[in-house]
A protein has these predicted regions:
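Short pre-catalytic strand/loop immediately N-terminal to key active-site residues, enriched for Gly-Thr
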Residues: 1-3, 147-149
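DPxDG-like acidic metal-binding loop motif
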Residues: 2-28, 42
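Glycine-rich beta-strand-to-loop/alpha-helix junction loops that act as flexible
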Residues: 4-5, 152-156
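Glycine/threonine-rich beta-strand-loop-alpha-helix active-site module
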Residues: 21-62
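Conserved, helical-rich catalytic subdomain that frames metal- and/or nucleotide-binding sites
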Residues: 45, 49-148, 163-169, 173-175
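Conserved SAM-binding loop
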Residues: 150-151, 160
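Short beta-strand->loop micro-motif that forms the acidic, two-metal-ion catalytic signature
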Residues: 156-163
Length: 176
């Protein structure tokens, strides 16, 4: 849920490109990265992006308004493959999808609360069914004042999005 091996792969591609003076463009590194993993192109590009397809079709976006995140791993890890297998059997009508266009508008306006309201992770329900602690952790972060609490990737890390450093630090102090 936090990039893991794909982040390592992206960093390795960038590092080797520089070390060996290969002079590959970012687009070329993204194409190579896709052969390693679907989210490697995103981690090669960096910044805030809209990802489509399997994650290889990237559109760079306006940076997010200043915000603070509190990361929390309330339970043991989950198998990404297992989560996606379960997701594939989930009815599309039951999924809370991100509101991508509203998110892009919020980014352009620098509107953090609107950005938070537009965000969703379609894998949350599947992962929470396997690890109920995730749902409790999300509720706890919201109780502690998060503008939005979400799970990263397929889990098991969750995060709270806060509008100030003070609010984030207070929430961190309030975690069990």
């Amino acid at each position: 849920g936090m990039g893991g091996g794909s982040a390592d792969a992206g960093a390795a591609l960038i590092g080797l490109n520089r070390l060996w003076n290969l002079n590959f463009s970012t687009a070329e590194l993204e194409r190579i990265g896709l052969t390693v993993g679907a989210d490697v192109p995103f981690l090669v590009r960096g910044g805030l992006c809209r990802a489509e397809g399997v994650g290889e079709q990237l559109t760079s976006l306006t940076p997010a308004p200043k915000c603070w995140l509190v990361l929390w791993q309330p339970c043991d890890g989950l198998s990404t493959g297992e989560i996606f297998t379960a997701f594939d059997t989930t009815s599309a009508e039951t999924l809370a999808r991100p509101q991508t266009l509203r998110a892009q508008e919020a980014l352009l306006a620098g509107d953090l609360p609107a950005l938070a309201a537009s965000m969703n992770n379609v894998l949350e329900g599947v992962s929470a069914a396997k690890r109920p602690q995730l749902e409790r952790a999300l509720h706890r972060l919201e109780e502690l004042g998060a503008l939005r609490a979400m799970m990263t990737g397929s889990g098991s890390v969750v995060y709270g999005l806060f509008g100030s450093e003070g609010a984030a630090n207070a929430a961190l102090s309030g975690l069990d």
